[in-house]
Amino acid sequence: NFSEDLIESDQETLSEEERAAVDALPSGNALLIVRRGPNQGARFLLDSDVTSVGRHPNADIFLDDVTVSRRHAEFKRSGKTFSVSDLASLNGTQYEGDRVESAELVNGSEVQIGKYHLTFFASKKDI
């Protein structure tokens, strides 16, 4: 199964601490981990229906880099499914290497916002 292989390969690159954080996620929650770029290793919990991302200090996820728009993107939760939506940002939002307006996220997939490469991990209880 491709998605299981993807999950396993991403899990192998996680530190013990990151793996424990992913394993502990309650149902309906997800985690973004900065894999490359500024703040590498930073973790962001997705635990609400809408999580804003941007360079604005009031953003739920504050990414302090000029490649990130003040109001860049939103992560949305619908049941146990998550998606990312670009908010007409200057540099766009990429999902698995392609610029997108919005995309439904799958476990282990990569979202790029500015210089930040974030890997999405869903709760194991929802996979």
Predicted regions and their residues:
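Short, Lys/Arg- and Gly-enriched loop/turn segments at beta-strand edges
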Residues: L118-D126
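Residue-level signal for short segments within beta-strands and strand-turn junctions
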Residues: V34-R36, R77, A122
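Intrinsically disordered, low-complexity acidic Ser/Thr-rich regulatory segments
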Residues: N1-L63, D126-I127
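Residue-level detector of flexible, active-site-proximal loop/helix-junction positions
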Residues: N39, N91, R99, K124-K125
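Forkhead-associated
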Residues: L45-T119
